[in-house]
């Protein structure tokens, strides 16, 4: 068995943990490869790995079946995006804070690696979001595919906007609000949840639309089927708004343009261990820790 390691080199904890992970893999006689972009930073910290074991993410996605994302939830989302087009199994190792998405805790690494080797796990297919900006002449600009959410609003705190929501070309509602979140089931436990949205099981195939601080009695969120197409347009008073994809990057949506979001399926699969129940994890992370 062979593993690809995608480490978050921005986390200081990675430099104490990665040598331990490598030793565990070597003790289990498992071959491993490390993402190329980590090489220089690891060597700065005096962590030296055989240069032949550094590979591009493209190589890893093409040649390997198992990818280990090492870091926090953000690292997991980044790995999901990078490897989404490959037929790989993604497992997250938690070195961050909340760690809702990752399946392996630091102290459980050795036992969970054994489970991976024994194929003692289940695979989940998760919904991704694909977003496109259409200008007035229907020229399309595709944005990066995301696993969590697409958020649109102003860059300034406390500035209300008016956004029109269309579902399958049918007008649904105009929201006076701080913004709108279009979320996958995976993202339903994140920003969407904090704004009052419903929680969906991570393996569900629906999308949700959640208004951020809506100034209206119609404060409801919408649960949409996988095949629905969401369109968002600006009111005449808005000149430009900003789009965030999984909390990263910023893309502009200008007057006269339309944001189109729809759910898509990708080749990647997500590892969940059989002794990990979604609702039990939910209670542990979002209820018991409060």
Enumerate the predicted regions with their spans.
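Gly/Ser/Thr-rich active-site loops/lids in small-molecule metabolic enzymes
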Residues: 170-177, 181-218
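Redox-cofactor binding/interface segments in oxidoreductases and associated redox assembly factors
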Residues: 5, 69, 182
